[in-house]
Amino acid sequence: MDVNPTLLFLKVPAQNAISTTFPYTGDPPYSHGTGTGYTMDTVNRTHQYSEKGRWTTNTETGAPQLNPIDGPLPEDNEPSGYAQTDCVLEAMAFLEESHPGIFENSCIETMEVVQQTRVDKLTQGRQTYDWTLNRNQPAATALANTIEVFRSNGLTANESGRLIDFLKDVMESMNKEEMGITTHFQRKRRVRDNMTKKMITQRTMGKKKQRLNKRSYLIRALTLNTMTKDAERGKLKRRAIATPGMQIRGFVYFVETLARSICEKLEQSGLPVGGNEKKAKLANVVRKMMTNSQDTELSFTITGDNTKWNENQNPRMFLAMITYMTRNQPEWFRNVLSIAPIMFSNKMARLGKGYMFESKSMKLRTQIPAEMLASIDLKYFNDSTRKKIEKIRPLLIEGTASLSPGMMMGMFNMLSTVLGVSILNLGQKRYTKTTYWWDGLQSSDDFALIVNAPNHEGIQAGVDRFYRTCKLLGINMSKKKSYINRTGTFEFTSFFYRYGFVANFSMELPSFGVSGINESADMSIGVTVIKNNMINNDLGPATAQMALQLFIKDYRYTYRCHRGDTQIQTRRSFEIKKLWEQTRSKAGLLVSDGGPNLYNIRNLHIPEVCLKWELMDEDYQGRLCNPLNPFVSHKEIESMNNAVMMPAHGPAKNMEYDAVATTHSWIPKRNRSILNTSQRGVLEDEQMYQRCCNLFEKFFPSSSYRRPVGISSMVEAMVSRARIDTRIDFESGRIKKEEFTEIMKICSTIEELRRQK
């Protein structure tokens, strides 16, 4: 029977059907090839928005820089980045007046964080620009490389393990006349194989020392590497995102800590909370505006969109904000916080891989690296690319483009939210001094504005005033893309509000299904997703039950583990049938071993092993969960694991799921092909790093949930811990005198070796 899809909506209120229009089913679009073009677009656009600013030259790097601050006031609706310092400072002052002590208290909280944060905070995060190798690396490796280079150049404050001390080294490094670095490289040689007599390519790994002069080092320290943002739905064009290096990251982290602390105290801020907490916060603001607009007042809401938020923001403005917020604080604290915006005012954007050329005869392909764009003949390029390159050329230095104005995506989300909220704060009647007033919500570049006034003219006047105030702070509300509605219907950060928030279920669609981690994790994540959607997203019992059945079906097809009594033939069915036949209690078999599904919507919170434990045959229990079974992966048995879920918008979020270690929780091995590439040295470093950390955690079993705070090195800490434990074990009779002496001797030897080093 054919179903007419419109029939599905007969009983559904229109606002609940909104989610069906979202582009969230199927695979998201990924970018291929180089991001060089997108990055040049960003750089050129940013300069265009600030073109009436003042040009200066950076004395250290020689980079040309454009400063639009306090530039001409806009005369049209075109986006522009001419923020006015005095207006920003005034907005900050009013924000403080409405929230007495907010900056003071947040500074005190941040100061505590600054003094306690360990360097390993910087190992969080994914790809990071590694300035020593001039390309992206996992954060932990990039940090390890940076510290290694610092130490070989005599910068050792970082050895205390505190982030603030690492940052002292960063500051120190910028004053050095030169920095020595070690780079990995590979040589390729064609040689004849003795056995097969064929020619083969032999690769040898090498490390070479290189010296960077002050200028080259500064350029690298100020570089943001760029990539194309992947998996963006609902857009035809891709765009570039930036990943900063380790020199910038620590400073940004402290600024964002302060800004986060402020955002937590602002009722209009959609950050840093998320999910239901965010919805509750938003609903409060709406309720306030609705109850205060009595019968005499009209209330309208703008679903707002800003034009190129990041490209019109300016680090110099952020510096002014920070200077104001920290004005009564100790000098060292103000200095630490002001470095991030100063570095961003002098930032360089790396243009990525460059362009790939193919000859017409298709026999030749060649890569033009970004470094060559400054000098190459432009006749090889098409018109649009030629225009881009011509425009960007004056800004190029060593393959990077000088980009003083603008912020890159996602760098100062919290701080830019504070800026946005400061405008919303100005909507109170005591500031507008007229009959209209406004309030709203801000979350990074997304906003919703609620305007109340006695009549339509008042509403219009309020919106105009808001629009102009934004312009003064370098924020450009898009008149084309924002729309206004009677209060009660609007959208904010993909939450749809219609007298309460409507579940936008389509956004969760990508996280349904089998994740592909391993049989154990996938089962757990699958049922957790369904459970979470019943709690948060109006997933009803009938639909949840159906989702569960579809998930189990999907799971069985993915892992070829159909029930033992099924007729379906797969590669595993022979083994599974054998197990099925010799099992007394068939209900106890896990789904991944061909067992039946015992999940229903009431028991989704119980891990499958626990759900079936009482039903299992004893020998099956013994095989499944025996720590001595070499196939049971016991890293650390933590009761909770984290899966990275990709929601339809916003950053990947961590989702917790119950983890029970069994023979099914295997970890796939690293692909071997990496071992032949120049990444190999990096990989060895990473394994070394891993081994040290594992060893450390053996000495301090609690370190997996609490970082040691102190200034001794890892080795010293382990030696002293070993001494204490040995003495306790000896005194309680757990070890013999000989063992005690031997361990103490080893400890002394280690200390002696450290001293000699």
UniProtKB/Swiss-Prot annotation:
It is an enzyme of class 2 (transferase). GO terms for molecular function: nucleotide binding; RNA binding; RNA-directed RNA polymerase activity. Residues 286-483 form the RdRp catalytic domain. Residues 249-256 are annotated as: Promoter-binding site. Residues 55-64 have a biased composition (Polar residues). It comes from the Viruses. Belongs to the influenza viruses polymerase PB1 family. Influenza RNA polymerase is composed of three subunits: PB1, PB2 and PA. Interacts (via N-terminus) with PA (via C-terminus). Interacts (via C-terminus) with PB2 (via N-terminus); this interaction is essential for transcription initiation. Interacts (via C-terminus) with human PKP2 (via N-terminus); the interaction competitively inhibits the interaction between the RNA polymerase subunits PB1 and PB2. This is RNA-directed RNA polymerase catalytic subunit. It comes from Influenza A virus (strain A/Russia:St.Petersburg/8/2006 H1N1). The gene is PB1.
